């Protein structure tokens, strides 16, 4: 399996190298954005509710390859609900990740990319979530002990006009914090040289 993935990555880089030589891009770019996330699993509770995501990212674009690498810092919140509780339980996740994107197509107005992030998540709760003596303010719940966990986040998206980036991602962290997300980011720098 590892050999197949390595072979595929090398083939993609070789194919993209010829295209990248024709498309000159600015080396550094930054991105600041907002988004929405929703938990994958409600666990022992009744429902997951959507919450906000804020993030910042700094990337370096390689000269001869359609690849960029960088660092992302983000914070995500979503809620879990239980019918027995009048308030929602907030799930917080703060992440620092090394990211890499492969630019599938880099046009003048539209660019498509697919990428991945790998790093560390600082979590407010972890699995299992147990409600022992429920009261109105979640005083009777407990969670697991894991607070710092590795995270993995595949993503795909489109960059419009070299300044607006729309991304869909999945964050795989710890069972109580896995989530899907959609984000809109403003890009400074980067893009094709004129």
Would you name each region that the model predicts?
Residues 1-26:
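Bacterial Sec-dependent N-terminal signal peptides
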Residues 20-63, 181-194:
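Short glycine/proline- and aromatic-enriched beta-strand/turn motifs that initiate or cap beta-hairpins
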Residues 26-28, 48-54, 90-96, 110, ...:
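Residues that define the transmembrane beta-barrel architecture of outer-membrane proteins
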Residues 36, 40, 102-104, 170-172:
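Short, well-ordered turn and helix-capping elements at secondary-structure junctions
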Residues 41-47, 83-89, 141-145, 171-173:
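Outer-membrane beta-barrel domain signature
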Residues 52-131, 164, 184-194:
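Gram-negative (and chloroplast) outer-membrane scaffold detector with strong preference
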Residues 72-81, 142-194:
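Predominantly the C-terminal beta-signal and adjacent terminal strand-loop region
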Residues 128-142:
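Solvent-exposed loop segments that connect transmembrane elements
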């Amino acid at each position: 399996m590892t050999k197949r993935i390595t072979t595929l990555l090398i083939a993609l880089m070789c194919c993209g190298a010829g295209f990248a030589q024709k498309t000159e891009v600015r080396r550094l770019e930054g991105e600041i954005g907002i988004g929405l996330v929703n938990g994958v699993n409600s666990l022992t509770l009744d429902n997951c509710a959507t919450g906000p995501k804020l993030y910042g990212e700094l990337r370096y674009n390689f000269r001869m390859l359609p690849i960029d690498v960088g660092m992302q810092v983000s914070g995500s919140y979503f809620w879990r609900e239980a019918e027995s509780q009048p308030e929602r339980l907030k799930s917080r996740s703060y992440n620092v990740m090394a990211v890499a994107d492969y630019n599938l197509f880099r046009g003048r107005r539209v660019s498509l990319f697919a990428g991945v992030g790998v790093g560390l998540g600082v979590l407010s709760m972890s699995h299992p979530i147990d409600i022992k003596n429920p009261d109105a303010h979640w005083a009777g719940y407990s969670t697991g002990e894991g607070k710092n966990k590795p995270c993995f986040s595949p993503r795909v998206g489109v960059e419009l006009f070299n300044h607006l980036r729309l991304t869909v991602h999945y964050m795989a962290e710890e069972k109580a914090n896995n989530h899907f997300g959609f984000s809109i980011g403003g890009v400074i720098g980067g893009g094709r040289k004129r």
